[in-house]
């Protein structure tokens, strides 16, 4: 799937006028839909944090993580949130689409595959570049943090196992992993060789 964050309202593509979780929007793109949303349509507070949609009260979000059983206590949740690469300010619109798409250019690309598929892509990437993919994962905020904010904030590739929200939210099957990378990554070249 491809995602693009843009200041200008997209033309030639429909606006989805509903609020939902970022991972659910990605799932729609996985199913073949191309659309955009206004950034305010992201309903998940953790996705809003990662994508820079609002400047949240970290203590309040820490309480949410504890309530979701994603943190042992609030202090640990605050440490987790402060350690996370995130976007500072999300532009007004997010575009979701199947990738590749002839008319839409992504800022970040998310691939879903088996461990063998993802391993093959990473091996070819390392063979081509001499670089390793250094994954940053936590099992918390996977689609929003690990697969969208991380590649955009760091300019690096990332592997994710998903999380308790994104695995069902994106319809991930048992054994499927996520590989995310910015559009400027040489991983684009690797994927084109498939």
Each model region followed by its residue ranges:
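Acidic, serine/proline-rich low-complexity intrinsically disordered regions
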Residues: 1-194
């Amino acid at each position: 799937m491809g995602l693009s964050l843009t200041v200008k309202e997209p033309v030639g593509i429909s606006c989805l006028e509903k609020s939902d979780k970022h991972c659910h929007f990605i799932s729609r793109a996985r199913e073949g839909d191309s659309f955009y949303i206004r950034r305010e349509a992201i309903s998940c507070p953790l996705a809003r944090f990662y994508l820079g949609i609002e400047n949240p009260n970290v203590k309040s979000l820490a309480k949410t993580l504890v309530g979701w059983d994603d943190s042992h206590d609030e202090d640990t949740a605050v440490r987790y949130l402060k350690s996370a690469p995130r976007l500072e300010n999300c532009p007004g619109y997010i575009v979701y689409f199947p990738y590749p798409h002839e008319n839409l250019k992504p800022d970040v690309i998310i691939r879903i595959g088996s461990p063998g598929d993802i391993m093959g892509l990473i091996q070819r990437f390392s063979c081509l570049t001499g670089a390793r993919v250094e994954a940053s994962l936590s099992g918390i905020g996977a689609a929003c943090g690990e697969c969208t904010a991380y590649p955009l904030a760091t300019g690096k590739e990332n592997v994710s196992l998903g999380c308790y929200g994104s695995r069902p939210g994106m319809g991930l099957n048992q054994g499927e992993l996520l590989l995310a990378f910015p559009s400027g990554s040489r991983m684009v070249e690797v994927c084109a060789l498939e």
